[in-house]
Amino acid sequence: LEKCGYEIKETAIRKGLRETAWNGRLQILEEHPLFIVDGAHNEDAAAKLADSIEFYFTNKRIIYIMGMLKDKEVDRVIALTEKYADQILTVTPPDNPRAMHAYDLATEVAKVHPNVTAVDSLEEAVELSHLLAGRDDVILCFGSLSYLGRILKLMEKRKTAGNKRKAKR
């Protein structure tokens, strides 16, 4: 922008960076358990996700909800991320002809990780992950941008339902 004649103070740049949120990149949807969505769907993004897991979640129990598209770097994403998970739930990204079926993804994950379960729907994955997770655990949903919007809606629905239950007390 400076090349175009705009004068921007360094403090404004720093403030902008500090206050910028990147939806779908380590986006926290719930705090107890910590429920995070991340758009990691290829080798580069999976490497960045692995770095973030190491930095932020060392010594945390982590449950993945993982869904991939067939034409992505499935083997590399699995190789870079599987070692951080205690449990991996695989899902089929809905409404996408390129979606890898949850059972096929589970078969690939099972080659390197012993605790993998294919789940029939995103709703079931969200519910099961919450049943498996303790208050201080991490649920991390990633693998394809194509279903993160659906996860956001499901989590909003859970939050609304939870608020209604609290209001009735």
Give residue spans per PLM region.
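Active-site-proximal loop/hinge segments that shape catalytic or ion-binding/gating pockets
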Residues: 144
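Short, flexible loop segments at boundaries between secondary-structure elements
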Residues: 93-96, 162-169
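Short, active-site-adjacent cap segments at secondary-structure transitions
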Residues: 147-149
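Active-site catalytic pocket residues across diverse enzymes, especially alpha/beta-hydrolases
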Residues: 1-4, 53, 109, 133, ...
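Nucleotide phosphate-binding/pyrophosphate-handling subdomain across enzymes
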Residues: 1-87
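C-terminal helical cap/extension that packs against the catalytic core
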Residues: 2, 34-35, 78-138
